[in-house]
């Protein structure tokens, strides 16, 4: 059988090499620097006789789309992941862009989120091409940019422009082999307070932007429950977290500006909408303007992703669960609609904009994403490649046409 031949050819060493190659190419976002890794992926497929499509919404941030055509073009299976990573930050024991193998794990920025998953896609694709596996349906691979900042230039763009169309999809984000169907909505709030830049000696008459910001944030924390109050199913609670505060230049200069960002997460099975959360948030700010003399504050709301859940009876759910059981020995836990995952991903774009049932499923533990000393278990890479291979054969390979090489 063709399946057995491909499964036998899955190589741990090859998966490690591909993962290390990808991790060694920095693609931090911000600022958004995916050009080099996109070139690596494009050349990977060009070297195997394929012609990947390169498309950009923002110059210098290329998405790579590979289309392997089948005989009937139905169904079409999508395998996808993002090429950007968050900045490495501090606290590493090794160089985050010189990946190392230790204790059956690969260490480096992006190993888990999600270049290990990308390596699995590349390896499965090269084996399908190597063994000349005939497809009945189409296989589309999309390597997209900008996921770490919402995905508008990546998955959002390729879906809106109809550059990617499929009947079902798998997003290789780190889920530790949970099968995720529901995700919380993400609302980012950016606050900027304005004051008077002057010497500390003038504090009695100056407006201090940092002091005004701390007063606003204290009020928001006090009113958190009123902003987030809602009726919902399960144990998922909305979240409001102040995650960045930046202000001031020197110890003896009163700051003229201070910026803060706030991350709000809203579960899908909740009657709190993005719009109502914004309105409640704005009400708190309005009251603060009346209470703080001279307060000058700007607010910007960015809806990164609305909460959503996909149907459990989608065809890809059953196929993927069955293939995972063949490899792992147990059925994967299905997450959604309740509870949902706290994470947000490009599945939002593929499902809500493209109506492509797209399961969030892949190697790695989410606790490792964005962490110092990020790592992924090599065994999970092998298992993922095995699962993806089985999914391909179950969905878009006509077994009657498979011949041994």
What spans do the regions from the language model cover?
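Fold-level recognition of mixed alpha/beta catalytic cores in primary-metabolism enzymes, strongest
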Residues: 106, 111-112, 116-222, 370-389, ...
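An extended, acidic, His-containing surface patch that forms the Zn2+-binding/catalytic region
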Residues: 67, 74, 209, 229-232, ...
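Short glycine/proline-enriched loop/turn "hinge" motifs that connect secondary-structure elements
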Residues: 12, 89, 133-134, 180-186, ...
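Acidic/His- and Gly-rich active-site-bordering loop/insert found
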Residues: 2-109, 130-135, 355, 365, ...
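Acidic-glycine-rich active-site phosphate/pyrophosphate-binding loop
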Residues: 86-102, 166, 181-192, 359
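Midchain, well-structured core segments that form catalytic/ion-binding scaffolds
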Residues: 154-292, 298-300, 304-305
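Generic non-transmembrane alpha-helical segments
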Residues: 18-21, 25, 40, 44-48, ...
């Amino acid at each position: 059988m063709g399946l057995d031949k491909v499964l036998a050819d899955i190589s741990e060493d090859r998966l490690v090499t591909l993962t290390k190659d990808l991790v060694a190419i920095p693609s931090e976002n911000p600022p958004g620097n995916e050009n080099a890794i996109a070139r690596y992926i494009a050349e990977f497929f060009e070297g195997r006789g394929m012609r990947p499509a390169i498309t950009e919404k923002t110059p210098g941030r290329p998405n790579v789309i590979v289309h392997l055509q089948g005989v009937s073009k139905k169904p079409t299976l999508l395998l996808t992941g993002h090429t950007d990573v968050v900045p490495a930050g501090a606290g590493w024991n090794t160089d985050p862009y010189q990946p190392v193998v230790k204790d059956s794990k690969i260490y480096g920025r992006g190993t888990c989120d999600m270049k290990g998953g990308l390596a699995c896609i590349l390896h499965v694709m090269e084996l399908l091409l190597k063994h000349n596996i005939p497809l009945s349906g189409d296989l589309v691979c999309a390597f997209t940019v900008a996921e770490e900042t919402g995905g508008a230039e990546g998955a959002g763009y390729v879906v809106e422009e109809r550059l990617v169309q499929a009947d079902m999809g798998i997003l290789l984000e780190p889920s530790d082999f949970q099968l995720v169907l529901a995700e919380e909505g993400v609302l980012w709030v950016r606050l900027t307070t304005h004051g008077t830049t002057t010497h500390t000696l003038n504090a009695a008459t100056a407006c201090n932007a940092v002091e005004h910001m701390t007063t606003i944030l204290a009020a928001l924390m006090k009113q958190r429950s009123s902003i987030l109050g809602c009726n919902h199913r399960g144990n998922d609670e909305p979240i409001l977290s102040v995650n960045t505060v930046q202000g001031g230049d020197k110890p003896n200069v009163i700051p003229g500006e201070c910026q803060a960002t706030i991350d709000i997460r809203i579960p899908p099975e909740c009657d709190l909408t993005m719009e109502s959360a914004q309105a409640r948030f704005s009400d708190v700010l309005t009251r603060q303007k009346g209470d703080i003399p001279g307060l000058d504050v700007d607010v910007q709301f960015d809806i990164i992703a609305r909460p959503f859940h996909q149907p459990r009876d989608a065809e890809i759910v059953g196929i993927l669960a069955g293939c995972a059981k063949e490899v792992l020995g147990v059925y994967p836990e299905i997450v959604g609609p309740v509870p949902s995952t706290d994470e947000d991903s490009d599945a939002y774009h593929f499902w809500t904009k493209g109506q492509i049932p797209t399961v969030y499923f892949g190697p790695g533990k989410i606790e490792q994403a964005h962490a110092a000393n990020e790592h992924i278990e090599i065994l999970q890479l092998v298992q993922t490649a095995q699962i993806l291979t089985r999914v391909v054969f179950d969905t878009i390979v006509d077994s009657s046409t498979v011949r041994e090489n």
